[in-house]
Amino acid sequence: MGRAPCCDKMAVKKGPWSTEEDAVLKSYIEKHGTGNNWISLPQRIGIKRCGKSCRLRWLNYLRPNLKHGGFTDEEDYIICSLYITIGSRWSIIASQLPGRTDNDIKNYWNTRLKKKLLSKQGKAFHQQLNVKFERGTTSSSSSQNQIQIFHDENTKSNQTLYNQVVDPSMRAFAMEEQSMIKNQILEPFSWEPNKVLFDVDYDAAASSYHHHASPSLNSMSSTSSIGTNNSSLQMSHYTVNHNDHDQPDMFFMDGFENFQAELFDEIANNNTVENGFDGTEILINNNYLDHDISSFIDYPLYDNE
């Protein structure tokens, strides 16, 4: 059951107050006061308004000690500080600002102050992003320059050491041998950019190869199987004799960038003793690998030309 209405809503006037109504209400209250009864006040002064409307009009607009006009910077600071502390409790905030009503403060916050703060915060945020971006770009450029300088110096030192230690005749022989092996390996096949060449045995030269189509790493020879769940590595396998370890075991593999990650996942998901690529037994569990994984993950022998 709700509260009883203070007056007949059909007999009262609604909408903005006129200048004459403001003058009548203000003059009567200044002379006689409210009498602590806002419900009967409209009848006493002879205006067709609701008692609640008269009370709000007096408190928010007609009181002599009210401040009208824009808010000062000090008032903005007080409003923001209290809003952060107690939220939108406008009557308490108004008690700290003499001459300001809770309704004025609420309207000012929703229409102007909040938008102004958001605009300043957005500008400061973008400025902070620009500063961080400039610092990051400078730091990245400096890091890249340092890496390039270190790489150049390391390359020069390695070349100098190689020239001092290796005999010139041996260098020529090594280059010639490397060229011959390269021609023997690449001549029978057409090079595809998305495939990477691996050579498990760099010292042995290949004489002939037999092609065996293999949809995944699992279909390689039984002596070089690592897991039973890996079916995403598509490749073609080339071998001479799996039982002859003197011959090289070479294969092309698609998607090399995912190979190491998938291989480590395969190792982490199994807890068995398996055979490595070279036929030796390796112990695999979730935390321990007895055989160094880098011994059978080789980098490309030659660059794509």
From Swiss-Prot:
UniProt keyword annotations, A-Z: Activator, Developmental protein, DNA-binding, Nucleus, Repeat, Repressor, Transcription, Transcription regulation
SUPFAM superfamilies: Homeodomain-like (SSF46689)
PROSITE patterns, per the entry: HTH_MYB
Family annotation (SMART domains): SANT
Record GO biological process: plant-type cell wall organization
Tissue-level expression: Expressed in roots, leaves, internodes, shoot tips and flowers.
Subcellular location: Nucleus
Residue ranges of domain HTH myb-type in the record: 9-66, 67-117
Pfam families referenced in this protein's UniProt entry, alphabetically: Myb_DNA-binding
Entry keyword annotation includes Magnesium: no
DNA-binding region: 38-62, 90-113
Record has Protease as a keyword: no
An example Gene Ontology CC term for this record: nucleus
GO molecular function, one term: DNA binding
Function as written in the Swiss-Prot or TrEMBL entry: Transcription factor that functions as a regulator of genes affecting cell wall organization and remodeling. Activates genes related to the primary cell wall and represses genes related to the secondary cell wall and expansins. Required for the regulation of longitudinal cell growth in stems, leaves, petioles, roots, flowers and siliques.
Name under which the protein is recorded: Transcription factor MYB87
Species for this entry: Arabidopsis thaliana (Mouse-ear cress)
